[in-house]
Amino acid sequence: MNSPLIKVHSQKWSKEWTRLFLSKKHWICILDSPIDQKLVKECQRYPISELDRVTKNFYSKNNYENIMKKLVYLISCDYTNKNIKLIDGYHIQLVYVKKLLQQDFNNAIVLVNTAISWIEYAVAAKFELVENKHGHSLTRKIKKLSNDIDKYSKKDPKKTYLVELYQVSLCLDDLWDTNKQNFEDGRYNVGIGRHSIQHGRVDPRRYNAEIMEKLICLLYALVKLPEIEDVIK
């Protein structure tokens, strides 16, 4: 990661550094979340080599209590609010998904495809491409977001929400990067992302709790973050 944000927040174990480090593993932590604040505080007590394990345990302990809290937040959102980038149909799906995961989190094997559709809708809505003939340009928009973050980070690397937006951008870049999802690698080895999931190139047995948790955390961040143009301007 060569973003100016990394250089500015290079002090180990600062809140920003911890969140940026976790984002390399696609664990998204945002400021406006008591759940994420608790995770960051927990991570600051451990060496770097333990952070991935600590995060996995944080979300899986007590019958996935913390990930369920994020689902409860998403379910309780006011879907009439234009700033909430989901629609009633996805709200209904979230209710059913929560029930299935509460019964057995291994039900993620049949839910990852659904979660990817939430992510794509939320991102398209952020870029105002849901009902737009240029919807296919979503990949370019995601790449442009990364470049914009770098540009604005050089101007004001401590600006509120840039770290959050950088985390989300990093995750979206990887999810949409077809170069990391080569079909010829086969269903047991192909990179797991939007392209390989939507086109059915991944053996569903690879859809585990961790992947589902990360997608829920990403959706949670996309819904809670302010509008992109309010951050980068």
Per-range role (PLM):
Residues 106-233:
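Amphipathic, oligomerization/interface secondary-structure segments
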Residues 80-120:
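A long, hydrophobic alpha-helical segment
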Residues 1-80:
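Internal, Lys/Arg-enriched amphipathic helical interaction segments that engage polyanionic partners
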Residues 24-27, 31-51, 56, 86, ...:
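Charge-enriched interaction surfaces
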Residues 11, 37, 44, 93, ...:
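Residue-identity detector for glutamine
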Residues 19, 53, 57, 66-73, ...:
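Charged/polar, solvent-exposed surface patches and flexible loops
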